[in-house]
């Protein structure tokens, strides 16, 4: 199955990366990870390790964390848009797997105070 091209702004064709299910999984896991990363700055027992997110937090405060997450999502969508099918599906699938690991680790850390990955 190929991606459906949709006419975009000024005649630019939009070619969303991956399948609809993969994109939904990406945005759900991305959202969970974004909330968890934001909570890392308000709980005393968890630390955000991503230096870009930490820098955005230092510059903009708590709103900087979702802003950093939005930048990450934008980068993933842009890269997926540039890749051809089926490589775009593989790329977004790999990102979904990474976010699955990150989100699971972060949620367990927030709920139990201990990281299952030992990070």
What label would you give each PLM region?
Residues 2-119:
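Hydrophobic alpha-helical segments at protein termini of multi-pass membrane proteins
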């Amino acid at each position: 199955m190929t991606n459906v091209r949709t006419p975009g702004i000024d005649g630019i064709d939009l070619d969303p990366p991956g399948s609809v299910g993969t994109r939904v999984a990406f945005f759900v896991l991305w959202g969970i990870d974004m909330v968890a990363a934001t909570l890392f700055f308000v709980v005393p027992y968890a630390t955000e390790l991503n230096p870009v997110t930490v820098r955005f937090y230092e510059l903009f405060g708590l709103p900087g964390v979702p802003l950093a997450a939005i930048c990450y999502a934008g980068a993933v969508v842009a890269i997926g848009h540039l890749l051809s099918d089926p490589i775009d599906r593989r790329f977004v699938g790999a990102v979904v797997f990474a976010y699955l690991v990150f989100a699971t680790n972060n949620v367990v850390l927030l709920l139990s105070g201990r990281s299952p990955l030992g990070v």
